[in-house]
Amino acid sequence: MALCCFAFSAPCLHLRSRRSCSSCFLRAKSAAFSSARFLRRAFSSSFLFKYSAICFSSSFSRSFFRFLFSSARRCRSRCVSPRGGAFPPGGPRRSRPRLSSSRDSKPSSTVSSSSLSFNSSSKDNSPSTNSSTSRSSGHGTGKHRNSPTDTKLTMLIISPLPRVWTESSFRIPSLRVWRLCTRRLVPHLWGTMFGPPTSSRPTGHLSRASDHLGPHRWTRYRLSSTVPYPSTPLLPHPENL
C-alpha cells in the first residue's frame, strides 16, 4: 500500500521517457496488489486452520496463545460495559462499581453475569467486585462464578489437547477434568486420540480394544480384568461332571 501511495503521490523520478515512467508505476501497482493478496491469504480461515497444529506444537506458541487470550479478555473488559452493551463514543466513565439493588433486578443482569464470568482471571479481584458479581449472577450466597477454576475449565475446553500435552513434560493441574469431559462427550475417541496410556488409567474401566489389540479388530470393547462385578461364570465341561 505504501508503494501504491508513493506511485500516486511522488513525482516521476525517471524522466527519460514516458515508457519508463509507466513501467515504474505498473511495478509499484503490482507489488501493492501482491502484498494485499498475501495479507488476505494470511488472514483467511483455511490458512489459519492449516497451520493451527504448528502454532500449538511448541511451548512458545502456547505462551503466545495465552498472551493473545489475555489481551482479548482485557480488551473485552475495557470495551464492554457492566450492563452488557458497548460504551458510548466518549469512552467509559471512570466510576466505582455500583452494587446491584433490588430495584435493578432486570433481565440484563444475566447478560452482565455472563460477560463478567468471561473475565474470571482478571487481576482486579477486590471484595467489592466479587460481591457485586455474586449478587448480579443471581446465585445468592453461593460461590460466585468469578473463580479461577472456571477459567481453567474454559481454557481446557476451547483449546486443543494433542498427545504431547499429556506427557510428563507438560503438566496440567486439572487434566482430570479434561479426561472426564472427553470421556463423557466423545467416548469413541477415548483411548485412540485423547488420554494417557492404559497403565495409568483407573482400574475397572471399560477400555477400548484398539488400545491393546490394534485398531482393526471385530471386538469393540473389552472389559478389564479388575472389574468390580464378577464376570460370567464358566460352564462345567461334560467330562468333568
UniProtKB/Swiss-Prot annotation:
Spans annotated as Disordered: 86-153
Alphabetical list of Pfam families matching this protein: Deltaretro_Tax
Residues spanned by motif Nuclear localization signal 1: 73-78
Motif (Nuclear localization signal 2): 91-98
Residue interval(s) of motif Mitochondrial targeting signal: 175-184
Origin: domain of life: Viruses
Keywords of this entry: Apoptosis, Host membrane, Host mitochondrion, Host mitochondrion inner membrane, Host nucleus, Membrane, Repressor, Transcription, Transcription regulation
Biased composition (Low complexity): 107-138
UniProt keyword Transcription regulation, yes or no: yes
InterPro entries reported in the protein's UniProt record: P30II
GO cellular component: host cell mitochondrial inner membrane; host cell nucleolus; membrane
Family: Belongs to the HTLV-1 accessory protein p30II family.
Job description of the protein: p30II is a multifunctional regulator that sequesters EP300/CREBBP and down-regulates CREB-responsive element (CRE) and Tax-responsive element (TRE) mediated transcription. Specifically binds and represses tax/rex mRNA nuclear export. Since Tax and Rex are positive regulators of viral gene expression, their inhibition by p30II reduces virion production, and allows the virus to escape the host immune surveillance and persist latently in an immune-competent host.
Assembly information from the UniProt record: p30II binds to the KIX domains of CREBBP and EP300.
Other comments on record: HTLV-1 lineages are divided in four clades, A (Cosmopolitan), B (Central African group), C (Melanesian group) and D (New Central African group).
Protein name, per record: Accessory protein p30II
Organism of derivation: Human T-cell leukemia virus 1 (isolate Caribbea HS-35 subtype A)
Taxonomic lineage of the native organism: Viruses, Riboviria, Pararnavirae, Artverviricota, Revtraviricetes
